[in-house]
A protein has these predicted regions:
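Bacterial N-terminal signal peptides that target proteins for export
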Residues: 1-10
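Extracellular interdomain linker/stem segments of modular secreted and single-pass surface proteins
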Residues: 146-154, 316-322
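Acidic, serine/threonine- and glycine-rich low-complexity intrinsically disordered segments
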Residues: 148-164, 171, 179
Length: 372
């Protein structure tokens, strides 16, 4: 009986140790930051030396979370369903320690023109990393994209097959991101970086946009984070930073419809917390702190007097964003919180409002995510 108990204990120990070891190994492997993967179609003004027909090749950029071992080489493979492998190319790679990341981009003109295709439809791809020193070849990310085409703005008989190709990114529109940003004048390991962080969020639009967005923050049904000087608002949120933009490489007819942009907005008068000796009072009023006002919040985004977006979130008593678990469950690969975005009005033109269900993150839809 005692021997049986010892054997059972040993088996349980080995099982638990195995789980911990596997988890530790997984943590020491490179991963892809999913929201950094951006794939576009690069249009060539030629197809198999025929300038009356245009073709395309892929361009991709992404960020890899370390460690990336010495001797590693990132590469990407694209496959057309029913036709097998299409193009494979290397991406610039550098050895990177754990806790740091490496951003790279590749494809486009690095691919020979004779590899261009006129195919439009679903395309599969895989981001891989080989290391001949270690004898390994691992898949880091697999995805699929929808490629479509639209006629260029050129006219005449020779322009009949001048099509411009693009990747459909409608799935992005209902997906938003909340995040805090450190004060970057301090070293990476200096705790002062996070003593007074900035509050930002990001969201997507489709189409050409000018004179862009105004962000408004609400808590308990009232707008907060406003400061004024002599009757004029000071320190209004800035939404002019473009994080990502997908645009066609040639002009199209119709124009301006095939542009997807991820904008970053930063609230300069709203802070998650303030652990510095700096005073909360400014010449224009008191800074608004999440740590003093926990609870539910809503961001409303206006454009030219019209409401175009709404997203909701919560903060705790320390001023931290309440994690809804979506980014963690889907292994986003960074510290951003994913939130659903309500798309309001016709600012973005016609778009596929259900694409997020199947196409999000290139065929890797979010678990636990729903759109209001």
């Amino acid at each position: 009986m005692r021997r049986q108990l010892i054997v059972k204990f040993a088996l349980v120990f080995m099982f638990l140790f195995g789980i911990q070891t596997a988890a530790a190994v997984e943590e020491d492997q490179p991963t892809i930051a999913k929201d950094s993967v951006q794939v576009t179609a690069f249009t060539f003004s030629v197809y198999r030396k025929n300038y009356d027909t245009w073709s395309w090749v892929p361009k991709i950029e992404y960020r890899v979370n370390g460690p990336i071992a010495s001797g590693s080489r990132l590469y990407v493979e694209f496959t057309i369903p029913g036709s097998g492998p299409w193009v494979k190319f290397d991406c610039q790679t550098e050895a990177t320690q754990k806790g740091f990341s490496w951003k790279t981009e590749c494809g486009a003109r690095e691919i020979p023109e004779d590899k261009g295709t006129t195919y439009a439809g679903p395309v599969n791809f895989a981001i891989r990393m080989r290391n001949e020193l270690a004898g390994t070849d691992a898949t880091l990310f697999t995805g699929k994209m929808k490629v479509a085409k639209v006629h260029s703005n050129e006219e005449g008989p020779k322009a009949a097959n001048h099509f411009v190709y693009y990747v459909d990114h409608d799935w992005n529109l209902p997906i938003g991101y909340l995040f805090y940003e450190p004060e970057k004048q301090w070293d990476l390991d200096d705790p002062r970086r996070w003593a007074k962080p900035k509050f930002s969020f990001a969201f997507w639009t489709r189409g050409e946009t000018s004179g862009f967005a105004e962000a408004h923050l609400f808590h308990g049904g009232k707008e907060v984070g406003k400061m004024y000087y002599e009757g004029k608002e000071m320190g209004a949120p800035s939404c002019g930073t473009t994080e990502v933009q997908h645009n066609t490489t040639q002009s199209t007819t119709p124009a301006g419809q095939f542009i997807w942009t991820r904008w970053k907005c930063t609230f300069t008068s709203v802070l998650p917390w303030n652990k510095t000796a700096d005073k909360y009072e400014t010449l224009f009023g008191r800074l608004y702190l999440f740590s003093e006002n926990p609870g539910d919040y809503e961001i409303k985004v206006m454009h030219q007097g019209h409401l175009i977006r709404s997203l909701k979130f919560a903060v705790d008593a320390e001023g931290k964003l309440v994690d809804n678990g979506i980014a963690t469950a889907n292994k986003l690969g960074n510290d951003r919180v994913i939130v659903p975005v309500q798309v309001i009005g016709d600012q973005d033109g016609q778009w596929d409002r259900t694409a997020w269900k199947t196409d999000a993150f290139y065929g890797n839809p979010l678990k636990g995510f729903s759109v209001p």
